[in-house]
Amino acid sequence: MKVDKIDKQILAILQKDGRVSASNIATELEISIPTVTDRIKKLQDSGIIKGIHAVLDPKPLGLDVAAIITLISESSFHYKEVTEAAEKMPEVLQCLTTTGKGSHMLFIVTRNSASLEDLLRTIQSWPGVQRTE
């Protein structure tokens, strides 16, 4: 799918507020509501819009510790396994493959320092993970 200026404007609006109505988008961009809904559907069908998610404040949920964990792998052989393991953990908000010193960076939230230690032990037991930093 070719993304044009209008599509990019719609995406920018949705990134700020995923719950904004098609009517409000249409008014802001001075286009019709059916045009907005058709374009959003095409953006979803093409996979450009993968979903609309709530951004949560972790503290009221009892998640008081946020951390960035760098994983040092034995080799690139385990990259896929590490990524798949990270995606299964609810504490992991994001898993990035990196170059340089580490193989992956994990952005996590957890309850407290004790649960962080438990999480680190779990991650260090994954195949190919040499250590965490």
Set out the residue ranges of the language-model regions.
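A compositional/biophysical signature of low hydrophobicity enriched in polar/charged and small residues
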Residues: 1-133
